[in-house]
């Protein structure tokens, strides 16, 4: 078997008869595997099994090395086009002072202007766990300060010892 899984080339194809298609789209019809292999050899190309489950199996005459190179190139292009969303985390406590809130809001605004998502986390310590609503209230206060330049992606919710809220840059 060839290096890639489920791709059969040339002599690896076990079917006695195949439906053969040329690299340029020429349909050779249903012919024996040997005849298809001869045509491929005369052209200096490979016989590649495309649809093994079809009756009869479909083979294509092509330059397999070139085909594989183009597939890898397409995958690299697709990977480049994918945008990685960076999430910045800002941790707060319930007893944070107003000037500290302002400082953290300033950082959040910078992150949002850079197009990054921001996750605000309020850590609940000790007895604060008994009343997680104070964390939600805290994040609602934060939301009032950032709502002019952010959209709320996730409302404040308790997750373990944290109350989390996710905001994204405002669109448009």
Curated annotation (Swiss-Prot):
Keywords: Cytoplasm, Initiation factor, Protein biosynthesis. InterPro entries: T_IF-3_C_sf, T_IF-3_N_sf, Translation_initiation_fac3_CS, Translation_initiation_fac_3, Translation_initiation_fac_3_C, Translation_initiation_fac_3_N. It comes from the Bacteria. It is found in: Cytoplasm. GO terms for biological process: ribosome disassembly. Its main location: cytoplasm. GO terms for molecular function: ribosome binding; translation initiation factor activity. The keyword Cytoplasm applies. GO terms for cellular component: cytosol; membrane. It holds the Pfam family IF3_C. IF-3 binds to the 30S ribosomal subunit and shifts the equilibrium between 70S ribosomes and their 50S and 30S subunits in favor of the free subunits, thus enhancing the availability of 30S subunits on which protein synthesis initiation begins. Belongs to the IF-3 family. Monomer. PANTHER family: TRANSLATION INITIATION FACTOR IF-3, TRANSLATION INITIATION FACTOR IF-3, MITOCHONDRIAL. This is Translation initiation factor IF-3. It comes from Campylobacter fetus subsp. fetus (strain 82-40). The lineage of its organism: Bacteria, Pseudomonadati, Campylobacterota, Epsilonproteobacteria, Campylobacterales. The gene is infC.
